[in-house]
């Protein structure tokens, strides 16, 4: 049965209201994306310096003699995966993408569910793994849209404490890396234990420093220097991953809201065409009835 003019008009009004919402959300997401991109650029200056120091340390004898708990290379009995997702929906394929790729990464490395646990940053990931019976040993919800460095300290403190207490023996950070405003790429980076090879490889990704063999004179002592540098390195990895993931999240949300707005425009145009045709048909019917009535009177 064909829709009445009033039904079509009601759908047009409803779609226009939805379009106003998606358009407003698109503008909000764009503003958040612009803000976090500026913060990410500023953070890169800091993290590049930290990783440069780390790279030089990895080429010296300091790490070889370190007794830092973060470098504990014990046999791996349990692996932890720090999975970064959003707390809410309406972010396009962002969450489904990172969870799909994380599951593939976990299945490849630790196919036995008893051999791993999940540390979830973001409610979507926490709920996803809980509903599937996965051991979610830690969850952190409510990360700011533009996260500050202090937010990460709580996460890093909890994670490193769990590592030191041998709750798990190695940790990977899994998230979506922001490539540009229309695409992101899955990343899984080893965070703990902090070993010489991992530090050197990670630092080399972000610095242009030439390889060198460095000897350091440290004050007040080698151990005290490393007790400061290694936690800063761990914090930089987690904060950088969260900042990167949030940037990808806002980009995905911006694209999703733009797509929803465009779809609403297309639907409104289609409904308007149906409305015009229905109205024209109603007018034609009314004219026909008037003409028929006039002819009946004349006869």
Curated annotation (Swiss-Prot):
Keyword set includes Transport: yes
Compartments reported by the entry: Cell membrane
Keyword annotations from UniProtKB, A to Z: ATP synthesis, Cell membrane, CF(1), Hydrogen ion transport, Ion transport, Membrane, Transport
GO biological process: proton motive force-driven plasma membrane ATP synthesis
Domain of life: Bacteria
GO MF annotation list: ATP binding; proton-transporting ATP synthase activity, rotational mechanism
Major localization listed first in the record, in broad terms: membrane
InterPro entries attached to this UniProt entry: ATP_synth_F1_ATPase_gsu, ATP_synth_F1_gsu
Topological relation to the membrane, as annotated: Peripheral membrane protein
One cellular component (GO) term of this entry: plasma membrane
Annotated Gene3D superfamilies: 3.40.1380.10, ATP synthase, gamma subunit, helix hairpin domain
Function: Produces ATP from ADP in the presence of a proton gradient across the membrane. The gamma chain is believed to be important in regulating ATPase activity and the flow of protons through the CF(0) complex.
Subunit-level organization: F-type ATPases have 2 components, CF(1) - the catalytic core - and CF(0) - the membrane proton channel. CF(1) has five subunits: alpha(3), beta(3), gamma(1), delta(1), epsilon(1). CF(0) has three main subunits: a, b and c.
Family label: Belongs to the ATPase gamma chain family.
Name assigned to this protein: ATP synthase gamma chain
Organism, scientific name: Levilactobacillus brevis (strain ATCC 367 / BCRC 12310 / CIP 105137 / JCM 1170 / LMG 11437 / NCIMB 947 / NCTC 947)
Gene: atpG
